[in-house]
C-alpha cells in the first residue's frame, strides 16, 4: 500500500448501504467491518493511514457514536497491526483536542478553499508538522463554474486558470496543506500540478482574500 513515495489512505465512518446510498456509521462494529473490507480490497495486511470521518454538523451529517468509542476501535485495530496511523476527517477543533487525549493524530482532512477557509486546525497542523489535506479545494466546482471576476483577473495576471490560482493560494496557506484534487481526466490532473510552480505574492494573496471577503 506504500510504494514510489506514495501512501494509500482509507476512510471509515461512511459507507454505502444495500441500495448503494451513502450513510454515516462510526460504530465500533462498522469501523472494524470497514477496515477489514479495505484490507481485503487492497490486498494488504496493514493500512498505512485510516481517517475517521466525523462530520462538522454544518455540511455533513454527524454520526451519534461518541468519538471516544470510534477512536478506541481504531486504536484496537492498530494494536492488532491492521493499521499504522490514524487521522481525522471533517473534524472540529474540540474533536481534535478530545482525540489527542486518546491517540496521536497523524493527518487531518477537512474542507478548505477560497470560500471556506476558517479552520483553526490548520494553525495546529502547521505548528505540529501534521499533514492537512484540503478537500473540496474548488468549492465543489463553484470556483470553476462561476469563477468570481477578481479570481479570473488574478489568473490572467499569472497566465494560469482560476483553478490553478485557487490551488496556488491554498498551497501558500501552509507548508503542511495539500489540496485533494479529484478528476477522471489525466490532462486535468497535469493542469492542476502547475499550481506548484505559481508563486503568488503576499500582496496578491491579500488582495484576492479581501476581494472575496475572506477571513484569514
Describe the predicted segments one by one:
Residues 1-7, 39-43, 100-101, 123-128:
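Acidic (Asp/Glu)-rich catalytic clusters
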Residues 4-18, 52:
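A short, structured active-site edge motif that brings together acidic residues
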Residues 5-6, 47, 83, 105:
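Local beta-strand N-terminus motif with an aromatic residue
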Residues 9-11, 49-50, 133-137:
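Non-cysteine beta-strand/loop elements that form the S-adenosyl-L-methionine
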Residues 18-29, 58-63:
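Active-site mouth loops of central-metabolism enzymes
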Residues 27-41, 92-96:
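Short, acidic/polar
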Residues 39-60:
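Active-site groove signature of glycoside hydrolases
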Residues 55-216:
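Beta/alpha (TIM)-barrel catalytic core signal, keyed to glycine-rich beta->alpha loops juxtaposed to Asp/Glu
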Amino acid at each position: 500500500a506504500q510504494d514510489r513515495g506514495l501512501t494509500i489512505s482509507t476512510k471509515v465512518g461512511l459507507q454505502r448501504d444495500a441500495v448503494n446510498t451513502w450513510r454515516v456509521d462510526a460504530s465500533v462494529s462498522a469501523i472494524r467491518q470497514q477496515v477489514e473490507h479495505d484490507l481485503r480490497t487492497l490486498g494488504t495486511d496493514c493500512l498505512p493511514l485510516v481517517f475517521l470521518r466525523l462530520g462538522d454538523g454544518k455540511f455533513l451529517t454527524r454520526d451519534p457514536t461518541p468519538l471516544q468509542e470510534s477512536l478506541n476501535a481504531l486504536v484496537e485495530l492498530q494494536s492488532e497491526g491492521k493499521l499504522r496511523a490514524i487521522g481525522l476527517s471533517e473534524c472540529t477543533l474540540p474533536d481534535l483536542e478530545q482525540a489527542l487525549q486518546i491517540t496521536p493524530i497523524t493527518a487531518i482532512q477537512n474542507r478548505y478553499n477560497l470560500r471556506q477557509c476558517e479552520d483553526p486546525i490548520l494553525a495546529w497542523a502547521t505548528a505540529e508538522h501534521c499533514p492537512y489535506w484540503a478537500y473540496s479545494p474548488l468549492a465543489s466546482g463553484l470556483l470553476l463554474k462561476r469563477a468570481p471576476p477578481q479570481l479570473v483577473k488574478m489568473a490572467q495576471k499569472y497566465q494560469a486558470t482560476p483553478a490553478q490560482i485557487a490551488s496556488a493560494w491554498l498551497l501558500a496557506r501552509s507548508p503542511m496543506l495539500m489540496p485533494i484534487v479529484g478528476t477522471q481526466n489525466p490532462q486535468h490532473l497535469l493542469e492542476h500540478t502547475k499550481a506548484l510552480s505559481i508563486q503568488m505574492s503576499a500582496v496578491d494573496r491579500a488582495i484576492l482574500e479581501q476581494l472575496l471577503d475572506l477571513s484569514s
